[in-house]
UniProtKB/Swiss-Prot annotation:
This is Nuclear distribution protein PAC1. Transmembrane segments: none annotated. It comes from Ajellomyces capsulatus (strain G186AR / H82 / ATCC MYA-2454 / RMSCC 2432). The gene is PAC1. The lineage of its organism: Eukaryota, Fungi, Dikarya, Ascomycota, Pezizomycotina. It is found in: Cytoplasm, Cytoskeleton; Cytoplasm, Cytoskeleton, Spindle pole. Dimerization mediated by the LisH domain may be required to activate dynein.
Length: 456
């Protein structure tokens, strides 16, 4: 039989056994073992016996204590593993799906409640699992969408919060909000969402706010018919853009920060070139809706391959600018998809009430929309805008807003803001789609005061 103990360990064990037997009035057994092991009185005298007589008992009780500790640690480990499994994002526990074709399914992962009035707007943190929502109850709430928990409530606005947006001017993530109280507020997540700045200048309700990528700027749209551009650092309005003849309800910047797309109650959508802030240019005005335009969105470069053939364009599979295609949603119950020339490429018909929010799928193939008809619809741009999925009763009442969690983008080559007109098209052709990892998570808000989280 193979030995587990070294010679020294075996010798220590033998002496401990002999000492234990001697101390417990078993001299004959001890003597027999001593004889078997050839231990003489000189090798193992009375003094040595005294040294070893309690050693066996100490080791035995130590083993019992260690065994109990092992059992306790195993139980604790099992509890922690169970807790970890519950905290692990479901998207990591399930088999990986192709994010480029993922669409939301019913029921939602979470239905979050805490607001006391209509939820008007939602925005995802660009990196973390935080989600901001703004409401008619004057508050902004910060949620953890992975855990389905409310983290905090921000108070500061004195009227309804109409829009929120996360951005990273100068590499520092901030939250912007706007309200019927005529103000735009900036909040710092790194300081517990402290209100670090309030921007004043609009003469009526501020309906939309967006950080302008790649620049230290913020855009806001208002019922006063203006679009304003703000310097985030100073809080000063650096430009007021006028052109709309009615309430400007929504504004959307291009991913390179050189264009703004706006829409409103004058039933038009306008594309602005803001590459030169002092002299913004209205590149094109799009008209065709028969009612107020509630929302607008610029198509990501990934949509170009699906929309270019419809527009009759041929060439490389990426746009020459960051504002080649766009979409608008209206109270006339339709969604229209446009090209940069102002041509309506598609009219998507299917909603039975006002269209309140639209968002392009990050992979570019789909357009998602929500409406006062309580549905969430998915339109396939590769099939000329066919509605391929409808989530009925996404909410109990009107669905007011929709947002897709942004992927984490790598550096993207952008058109320099000082590019002169007529300059070589080689610069523009360097503009390609951002390299992002798609997060399959969307959120919707409603008059029913609920925030629905749909996730893979």
């Amino acid at each position: 039989m193979a030995r587990l103990l070294t010679n020294r360990q075996a010798d220590e064990l033998h002496k401990s056994i002999i000492a234990y037997l001697s101390a417990n009035d078993l001299p004959n057994t001890a003597a027999a073992l001593r004889a078997e092991l050839n231990l003489t009185e000189e090798d193992f005298d009375a003094t040595a016996v005294k040294k070893y007589e309690t050693l066996l008992e100490k080791k035995w009780t130590s083993i019992v204590r260690l065994q109990k500790k092992i059992m306790d640690l195993e139980a604790r480990n099992a509890a922690l593993q169970s807790e970890l499994d519950n905290l692990t994002p479901a998207s990591l526990l399930k088999p990986r799906r192709d994010p480029t074709s993922w669409l939301p399914t019913h029921p939602p992962r979470y239905s979050l409640e805490s607001h006391r009035d209509t939820i008007n707007c939602i925005a995802f943190h660009p990196k973390f699992s935080s989600l901001a929502s703004g409401s008619d109850d004057f508050t902004i709430k910060i949620w953890d969408w992975e855990l389905g928990e409310l983290e905090m409530t921000l108070k500061g606005h004195t009227r309804a919060v109409l829009d929120v947006d996360y951005g990273s001017p100068q590499g520092i993530t901030m939250l912007a909000s706007c309200s019927s109280d005529l103000s735009v507020k900036l909040w710092d997540p790194a300081e517990g969402y402290k209100n670090v700045r309030t921007l004043l200048g609009h003469d009526h309700s501020v309906s939309a706010v967006r950080f302008i990528p790649c620049r230290n700027l913020l855009a806001s749209a208002s019922r006063d018919k203006d679009v304003r551009i703000w310097d985030v650092t100073t809080g000063y309005c650096v430009r007021s853009i006028q052109g709309h003849t009615g309430w400007v309800r929504d504004v959307c910047p291009s991913f390179d920060g050189n264009f703004l797309f706006s829409s409103g109650d004058d039933m038009t959508a306008r594309l602005w070139d803001i590459s030169a802030i002092p002299n913004p240019e209205n590149k094109v005005t799009m008209a065709g809706h028969e009612h107020f335009i509630e929302c607008c969105a610029l198509a990501p470069p990934t949509s170009y391959q699906y929309l270019a053939p419809v527009a009759g364009l041929k060439g490389p599979s990426y746009p020459k600018s960051a504002a080649e295609f766009m979409a608008t949603g209206s109270r006339d119950k339709t969604i229209k998809v446009w090209d940069v020339r102002g041509t309506c490429l598609m009219t998507l018909i299917g909603h039975d009430n006002w269209v309140r929010g639209i968002v392009f799928h990050p992979a570019g193939k789909y357009l998602l929309s929500v409406s006062d008809d309580r549905t969430l619809r998915c339109w396939d741009l590769s099939q000329e805008g066919k509605c391929v999925k409808t989530i009925k009763d996404a909410h109990d009442r009107f669905v007011t807003c929709l947002s897709w969690a942004p992927g984490v983008a790598k550096d993207v080559p952008a058109i320099p803001s000082n590019t002169a007109k007529g300059e070589s098209s080689e610069i523009k052709e360097t503009l390609k789609s951002p390299d992002v990892q798609i997060r399959c998570v969307i959120a919707t808000g409603s008059v029913d005061r609920k925030l629905q989280i749909f996730a893979a």
